[in-house]
């Protein structure tokens, strides 16, 4: 279940990539090292007050093509631990039966919602050229955009126009395994997402997985994360997930475990000492939640014991294999007071 930040050199499609470049996931028993999009090491993005890391680093993962992200989801779905066959309520029950459909021939263009009827539901999508995506087992409902020439083949399932699907809300505060629309099923805005198991979901800018301009970002962490959900996005929860999850507070000794924190809200601004709890570790500091290269203020892997960092109000701190301890000036016994 642990994720570790490590340097990566493997090819991009040879392993599962997650939000951190070189993030190792054991969410599904996978212990594969993930590569960066470029496969090359680069300097950290810093401002004038932040010194570049002296350690070898790999560029943190940014948003990626939606097609790459959904292919990783299809890999995960080959042996899902759970399949959600729930049929949502719809305005008009005009479900299309399983079969093969070609957009422009026996299927109109538009966005559809595909639902498995059993644990043996499979889905194949192609762009009519050389692009294809296959879910050997479709683990839950999925939004899919069809354009002229695209084909859709579903077995042991059904589908309907997405516009006919009523709001799919949370049950007892949790969104079940499935695909949801931001602005319809999920409110837009900055929030924390996760569960008692952590966070395991993907945010897509579009449900057209063959659109070269569509992007996606996958999270697979042992803790809740912050994200700015925007209207029109599609979110695929790979486990039951809640919004507005409480970020864990400080330990009894005042330290903070690995996780994601907003400085000025979850932790105070000021100096902190980093204490490694794992030999493979790392941290990132974000200016904002766009999760692009310009969002990154600082990051470092394989942090040495005693490393001191200064966290500014309004930034986001995220770590793996590290404890965050309020800094104590040499010769004193108590951490200095900081203000929120």
Residue ranges of predicted features:
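Beta-sandwich interaction modules
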Residues: 100-103, 130-146, 179-182, 215-229, ...
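A glycine-anchored, Pro-Gly-centered beta-turn/N-cap motif
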Residues: 97-99, 108-111, 178-190, 259, ...
């Amino acid at each position: 279940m642990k994720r570790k930040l490590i340097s990566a050199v493997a090819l991009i499609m040879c392993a599962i990539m997650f939000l951190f470049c070189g993030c190792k996931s054991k969410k599904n028993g996978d212990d594969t090292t993930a590569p960066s999009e470029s496969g090359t090491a680069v300097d950290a993005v810093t401002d004038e007050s932040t010194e570049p890391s002296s350690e070898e680093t790999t560029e943190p993962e940014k948003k990626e093509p939606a097609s790459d992200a959904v292919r990783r989801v299809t890999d995960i779905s080959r042996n899902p631990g759970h399949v959600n066959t729930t049929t949502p309520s719809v305005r008009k029950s005009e479900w299309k039966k399983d079969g093969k459909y070609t957009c422009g021939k026996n299927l109109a263009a538009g966005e559809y919602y595909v639902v498995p009827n059993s644990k043996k539901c499979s889905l194949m999508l192609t762009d009519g050229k050389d692009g294809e995506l296959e879910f050997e087992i479709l683990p839950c409902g999925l939004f899919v955009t069809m354009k002229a020439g695209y084909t859709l083949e579903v077995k042991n399932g059904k589908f309907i126009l997405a516009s006919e699907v009523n709001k799919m809300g949370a049950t007892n505060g949790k969104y079940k395994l499935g695909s949801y629309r931001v602005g319809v099923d999920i409110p837009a805005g900055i929030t924390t997402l996760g569960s008692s198991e952590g966070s395991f979901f993907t945010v897509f800018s579009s449900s057209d997985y063959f659109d070269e301009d569509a992007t996606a970002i996958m999270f697979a962490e042992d803790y809740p994360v912050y994200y700015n959900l925007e209207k029109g996005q599609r979110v695929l929860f790979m486990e039951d997930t809640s919004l507005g999850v409480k970020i864990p507070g400080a330990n009894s000794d005042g330290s903070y475990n690995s996780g994601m924190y907003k400085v000025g809200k979850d932790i105070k601004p000021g100096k902190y000492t980093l204490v490694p709890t794992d030999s493979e570790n790392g941290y990132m500091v974000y200016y904002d939640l766009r999760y692009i290269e310009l969002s990154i203020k600082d990051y470092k892997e394989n942090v040495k014991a005693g490393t001191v960092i200064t966290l500014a109000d309004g930034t986001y701190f995220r770590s793996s294999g590290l404890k965050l301890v309020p800094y104590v000036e040499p010769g004193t016994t108590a951490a200095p007071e900081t203000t929120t």
